[in-house]
Amino acid sequence: MMLEHVLVLSAYLLSIGIYGLITSRNMVRALMCLELILNAVNMNFVTFSDLFDSRQIKGDIFSIFVIAIAAAEAAIGLAIVSSIYRNRKSTRINQSNLLNK
């Protein structure tokens, strides 16, 4: 696959993720958009690692670390959303004012 195609796809994923993160009112959807952003970053790491020096796998290893951190972030985020839903009966961002209790 050509470099430009991968970068355009990564830019689309990044822009969709940022747009969804800004406009989302649901916490689960916001977490999914954050995962899209992290996947776009991973695509860039792997692409540029292969472009500059295909013998070294620094970009691939860094992508594996980002995937592991994203998995932990998703697990913790979903646990927090589940706890908020149990207490507030809603996962909407604008309805869950956690500072007022």
UniProtKB/Swiss-Prot annotation:
It is found in: Plastid, Chloroplast thylakoid membrane. Pfam families: Oxidored_q2. It is an enzyme of class 7 (translocase). It catalyses: a plastoquinone + NADH + (n+1) H(+)(in) = a plastoquinol + NAD(+) + n H(+)(out); a plastoquinone + NADPH + (n+1) H(+)(in) = a plastoquinol + NADP(+) + n H(+)(out). One of its GO terms (molecular function) is oxidoreductase activity, acting on NAD(P)H, quinone or similar compound as acceptor. Its EC number is 7.1.1.-. NDH is composed of at least 16 different subunits, 5 of which are encoded in the nucleus. NDH shuttles electrons from NAD(P)H:plastoquinone, via FMN and iron-sulfur (Fe-S) centers, to quinones in the photosynthetic chain and possibly in a chloroplast respiratory chain. The immediate electron acceptor for the enzyme in this species is believed to be plastoquinone. Couples the redox reaction to proton translocation, and thus conserves the redox energy in a proton gradient. This is NAD(P)H-quinone oxidoreductase subunit 4L, chloroplastic. It comes from Nandina domestica (Heavenly bamboo). The lineage of its organism: Eukaryota, Viridiplantae, Streptophyta, Embryophyta, Tracheophyta.
